[in-house]
Design a protein with these regions (language model features):
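C-terminal helical subdomain
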Residues: 3-17, 192, 210, 226, ...
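The beta1-alpha1 cofactor-binding region of Rossmann-like NAD(H)/NADP(H)-dependent oxidoreductases
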Residues: 63-64, 84-95, 129, 245-246
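Conserved mid-core segment of classical short-chain dehydrogenase/reductases
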Residues: 94, 117-133, 175-183, 221-226
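Conserved glycine-rich cofactor-binding loop
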Residues: 30, 37-38
Length: 275
């Protein structure tokens, strides 16, 4: 194809696709979000409900939080069902998939957001070996198991689907100094590489992408000393921490028709802190 001249507008997309701007609507879709009791998972669930999707809300132990997310999603006029599962356990993943299929009939978007907390509460006192075990069990193994199950479900439905996995923007840059970065890069780097491989295997009817959050205002960020938070803020080109809603907006895009030609990619949502 020749390069368009100044002022020239291309009238058709390759392959005969309609060149009109695609929509960010998720109307009529069914989405499963794990780790939906709070934080990023809750923000994604509410953004999906606002975009027109019905949502299944996966949680491990915080049922109250999942119910609160469900109430807010229902206020947007959408169906929202909390479903308990520990994605580190293969039997729970199978049961979760069966529950979604029975309740909603299908799943169009499966978001593996659940992750192990190794930085706050009692988990903060664990050894780095114990923290690594937790991260690998939940963040990596759980994501792999759940993604395989999602592919199984989506291949059985004519519409295919979308899988979104949660990584970390710093895996693109080798992380930072210290054990913190090493254990997170081990788990989240695995999620990134696995997702790229799965995108090839699941194509052409299933898209697989990765979200790479940077410094986001979650429970961990709130627990940091103010001096540390300010130092981090100064290092971010856009001059602020991200919010769970920033991640949610990216998740809506990746699940929508606007991203219909995007697969096997990581979308880093980080204010430019890793480029």
């Amino acid at each position: 194809m020749s390069k368009p001249r100044s002022g020239e507008v291309l009238q058709a997309a390759p392959g005969g696709q309609d060149a009109a701007a695609p929509t960010l609507s998720l109307s009529g879709k069914v989405a499963l979000i794990t780790g939906a009791s709070s934080g990023i998972g809750r923000a994604i669930a509410l953004a999906y409900a606002a975009a027109g999707a019905d949502v299944a809300l996966g949680y491990r132990s915080n049922r109250r939080g999942a119910e609160e997310t469900a109430e807010q999603a229902r206020a947007a006029g959408r169906r929202a069902d909390p479903l308990q599962a520990d994605i580190a356990e293969s039997r729970d993943v199978d049961a979760l998939a069966d529950a979604v299929r029975r309740a909603f009939g299908r799943v169009d978007v499966w978001i593996n957001n659940a992750g192990a907390d190794i930085l706050t509460g009692a988990a903060a006192s664990l050894s780095w070996t114990e923290k690594l075990d937790r991260l690998l069990a939940v963040d990596l193994r759980g994501t792999v198991l759940a993604s395989w199950k999602a592919v199984e479900l989506m291949r059985a439905q004519p519409s295919g689907g979308v899988i979104l996995n949660m990584s970390w923007d710093h895996v693109l840059a080798g992380g930072m100094k210290g054990e913190y970065a090493q254990v997170f890069c081990a788990a989240k780097g695995g999620v990134y590489s696995f997702s790229r491989a799965l995108a090839h295997a699941a194509a052409p009817h299933i898209r697989v992408n990765v979200l790479g959050p940077g410094w986001i205002e979650t429970a961990y960020g709130s627990a940091l000393p103010e001096s540390v938070k300010q130092r981090i803020t100064k290092s971010i080109p856009l001059g602020r921490w991200g919010t769970p809603e920033d991640i949610a907006h990216a998740a809506v895009y990746l699940a929508s028709d606007a991203a219909r030609y995007v697969t096997g990619q990581m979308l880093a949502v980080n204010g430019g802190s890793v480029v």
